[in-house]
């Protein structure tokens, strides 16, 4: 029989992505559509792709020949990939292993950014054994793209989070007890509710269990994952009524066993799980150099301090108070120590190794010579800067400035131009003087910006620029009078003045 004539409607184009400097893998076939029947796969012979074509981020077309068909196959090849990876910073107390971020911000050639997982090098304990700074290298997972973690180790600490409290959605951190009264479960001691009365009756007790001593502790977890904690404090709120009270004697201990402890099957009565490592006295050591606000009493939070230990668990082992039938705890707290990260920083941008003048947080757009500039940036006070290059015509170079605590302070855009007028640096000629009136004893709120006048080709231009003020004298607001503060206009050799009147 005669076969029905078919005409080619089109050859479906294909889209392929590749990274810079990587030749694309083009499909062996293309789909040919006819005016009748189904499309068919046909072998394609593609034009060669050169190294120059994949040497920059862009999209180009590759033609292909299909045997017996006049129409050409087309492949749209997009060269894309990660063009910048941020560096990050953390702080840690002396002797505590720093927490390594799981991910960093990566910037893609398509203009988007995303959180990329990182594989970090190993941390040497000597690196955080004393005050100082060190840098840890890392790579974006599955790539050779490098990043760095800047770690500052310090003895200057402040109180951090309560690492004993329950974490929503997980059993860890876990409160556990050797024994408990069924009506007063141990989960009450880390539920963030402190009550020394029956309204509410929120406590653990071992009332009526007739034990000479019992223990209550915390098994640590970080975001629900079993982990060690560096611990040097314990805060215990004992409760008292006619049947229970604060212990007559106590010992604070930390878990020192070699076996990683599992979550007890019954946290209220760990002693019933005979083979659990918590039941082996050899796995516990008494803390050293214990200090406490005396006397230890019920009805308040009692604060214990001791030498720092690195452990999975801490407990208080208690003897039942005389004339009572048990001990009682409303809440247990253990606070991490942390090094306060810097929240401020100043940025320096360099173009071809020359400092870009006039960089101020109140101005985000700058113009630089378009002829292949090399841009880098640095930040003061342990801040960091990420330079995201321009990969498409008309796109600016971006500089993201972050403080040590991770706050993005500003994003600057460096526009590439050959326009002499745009490249011209205006000269500042004057700073507006400011004034404030406050009442005696009131707080003084300082302006974050000042007006600065620049001389232009056709007149004067006024800009609001960020200023750093000197500290207010300690007693200046405690009595009537006036004083003058000076401030530094960021990015310029300019001094601002603010007159303050106190009445």
Each model region followed by its residue ranges:
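Beta-rich interaction/scaffold domains
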Residues: 2-161, 338-376, 380-503
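Extracellular carbohydrate recognition and processing domains
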Residues: 269-307
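N-terminal cationic leader/targeting segments used for protein routing and processing
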Residues: 3, 163, 182, 189-193, ...
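Aromatic, loop-rich ligand-recognition surfaces of beta-strand-rich domains
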Residues: 198-270, 298-341
């Amino acid at each position: 029989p005669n076969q029905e004539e078919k005409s080619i409607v089109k050859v479906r184009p294909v889209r392929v992505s590749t990274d810079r400097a990587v030749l694309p893998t083009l499909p062996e076939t293309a789909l040919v559509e006819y005016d009748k029947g189904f499309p068919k796969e046909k072998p394609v012979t593609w034009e060669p792709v050169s190294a120059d074509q994949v040497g920059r981020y862009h999209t180009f077309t590759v033609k292909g020949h299909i045997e017996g068909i006049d129409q050409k196959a087309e492949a749209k090849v997009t060269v894309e990939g990660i063009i910048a990876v941020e560096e990050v910073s953390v702080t840690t107390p002396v002797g505590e292993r720093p927490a390594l971020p799981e991910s960093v911000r990566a910037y893609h050639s398509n203009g988007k950014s995303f959180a990329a997982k990182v594989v970090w090098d190993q941390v040497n304990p000597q690196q955080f054994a004393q005050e100082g700074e060190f840098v840890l290298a890392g790579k974006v997972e599955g790539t050779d793209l490098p990043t760095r973690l800047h770690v500052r180790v310090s003895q200057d600490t402040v109180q951090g989070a309560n690492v004993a409290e329950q974490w929503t959605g997980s059993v860890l951190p876990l409160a556990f007890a050797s024994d408990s009264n069924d009506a007063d479960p141990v989960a009450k001691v880390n539920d963030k509710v402190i009550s020394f009365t029956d309204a509410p009756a929120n406590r653990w007790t071992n009332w009526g269990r007739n034990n000479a001593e019992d223990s209550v502790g915390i098994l640590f977890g970080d975001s629900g994952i079993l982990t060690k904690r560096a611990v040097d404090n314990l805060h215990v709120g004992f409760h008292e009524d006619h049947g229970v009270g604060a212990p007559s004697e106590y010992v604070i201990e930390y878990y020192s066993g070699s076996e990683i402890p599992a979550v007890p099957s019954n946290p209220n009565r760990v002693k019933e799980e005979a083979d659990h490592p918590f039941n082996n006295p050899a796995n516990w050591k008494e803390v050293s150099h214990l200090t406490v606000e005396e006397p230890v009493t019920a009805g308040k939070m009692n604060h214990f301090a001791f030498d720092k230990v690195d452990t999975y668990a801490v407990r208080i082992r208690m003897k039942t108070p005389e004339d009572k039938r048990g001990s009682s705890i409303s809440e247990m707290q253990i606070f991490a120590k942390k090094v306060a990260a810097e929240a401020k920083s100043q940025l320096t941008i360099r173009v071809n190794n020359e400092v870009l003048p006039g960089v101020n947080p109140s101005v985000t757009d700058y113009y630089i010579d378009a002829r292949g500039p090399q841009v880098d940036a640095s930040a003061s006070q342990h801040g960091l800067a990420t330079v995201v290059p321009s990969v498409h015509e008309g796109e600016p170079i971006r500089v993201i400035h972050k403080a040590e605590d991770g706050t993005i302070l500003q994003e600057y855009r460096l526009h590439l131009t050959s326009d002499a007028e745009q490249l011209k640096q205006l000269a500042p000629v004057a700073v507006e003087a400011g004034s404030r009136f406050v009442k005696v004893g009131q707080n003084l709120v300082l302006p974050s910006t000042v007006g600065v006048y620049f001389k232009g080709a056709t007149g004067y231009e006024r800009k609001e620029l960020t200023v750093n003020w000197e500290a207010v004298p300690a007693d200046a607001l405690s009595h009537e009078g006036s004083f003058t503060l000076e401030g530094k206009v960021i990015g310029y050799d300019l001094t601002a003045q603010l007159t303050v009147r106190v009445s």
